[in-house]
């Protein structure tokens, strides 16, 4: 019995050390996100389809610079395209991440907005490269704070890799 416990602890330590390697300087990041499950709230809470694509680079250990582009369909009158940049800090000990950024939104009826985008989430690593990243976000609208700001839950799928 003691042998099983020791081997289990040994494999857990090896697995934890391997998980930290994902946060090394020089890694690249590709991801896709959605918050289409209706798990967000704003004054304009109707049907919604949101898809985003992200790419990034780990410029220091645990620090990731990310660019994003995406599409947000809210109803037949409001489709939005967005582009933004974010900086993410990955907490190596537990997989949590803190992220902040900004995005520019262009909507159908000549609607333009800039939003600040703080976010907190978790990286569930399936292996050394593939993650599922649920996160809580708040999109703070600078043009219409009361009607366009929203908070919610989004889920991402990401791939961390080296360029060699």
Predicted regions and their residues:
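Gram-negative (and chloroplast) outer-membrane scaffold detector with strong preference
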Residues: 56-136, 159, 164
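Surface-exposed strand-loop-strand hairpins of Gram-negative outer-membrane beta-barrel proteins
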Residues: 37-51, 68
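Positively charged n-region of N-terminal signal peptides that target proteins for export
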Residues: 1-5, 22
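Transmembrane beta-strand segments of Gram-negative outer membrane beta-barrel proteins
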Residues: 22-38
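Sec/Tat signal peptide C-region and signal peptidase I cleavage site
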Residues: 16-21
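Outer-membrane beta-barrel "beta-signal"
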Residues: 29-31, 124, 148-164
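Sec-dependent N-terminal signal peptides
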Residues: 5-15
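Residues that define the transmembrane beta-barrel architecture of outer-membrane proteins
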Residues: 26-28, 45-49, 77-83, 112-116, ...
């Amino acid at each position: 019995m003691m042998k099983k416990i020791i081997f289990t602890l040994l494999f857990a330590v090896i697995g934890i050390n391997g998980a930290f390697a994902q946060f090394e300087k020089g890694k690249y990041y590709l991801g896709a996100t959605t918050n289409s499950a209706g798990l967000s709230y704003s004054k304009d809470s109707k049907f919604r389809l949101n898809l985003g694509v992200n790419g990034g680079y780990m410029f220091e250990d645990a620090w990731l610079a990310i660019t994003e582009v995406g599409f947000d369909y809210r109803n037949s009158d409001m489709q939005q395209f967005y582009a933004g940049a974010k900086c993410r800090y990955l907490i190596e000990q537990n997989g949590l991440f803190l992220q902040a950024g900004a995005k520019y939104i262009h909507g159908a009826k000549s609607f333009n907005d800039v939003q600040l985008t703080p976010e907190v989430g978790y990286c569930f690593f399936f292996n050394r490269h593939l993650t599922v990243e649920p996160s809580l976000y708040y999109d703070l609208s600078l043009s219409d704070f009361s009607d366009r700001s929203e908070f919610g839950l989004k889920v991402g799928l990401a791939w961390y890799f080296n360029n060699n």
